[in-house]
Amino acid sequence: MGPMVRQLVFVGLVGCILVVWNAHADHDVVVAQPRTPIVVTRIYTGPDGQTHAEQIDVKLTPGGGSGELSEMAAVTGLQFRRQAPNYFQDWHPAPRRQYVITLSGRGEIELAGGKKIPLGPGHILLAEDVAGKGHISRGVGSEDRISLFIPLAER
């Protein structure tokens, strides 16, 4: 076998090895991206007696093998609620400090000044406007809104 043939055989073998090795390599490698925060809409009574809103990112810390965890919140119970699509509740404060998580359906709350906050599936609301004028609650869309109330223990 001549030197040219040996060189072609060598190049062919190396090519085959690279193809086989590449076929078994992990191609799902992605560049690390920041994780999307868990966002809570907090409504609270301001010094003016009106309800205001802010977005809060939930602070998470490594939780061992179970992912990331927030601090444990002390709660007093849990309650489900179903509301008709056309529900309307005029100005009212929250009855207590509580999380309200929309599971299905849609609603919105309206604050003084006309600001509306949409409440869709997965939305987490922290209602702390227990004094003052409060907010308006209403249904949006054509299906019942199912939500979960999680009252917080007193601080």
What are these regions (language model features)?
Residues 76, 114-116, 120-123, 129-155:
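Ligand-binding loop in jelly-roll beta-barrel domains
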Residues 25-82:
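A short, N-terminal "cap"/entry segment at the start of jelly-roll beta-barrel domains
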Residues 57-61, 76-94, 129-132, 154:
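Conserved short histidine dyad/triad with adjacent acidic residue
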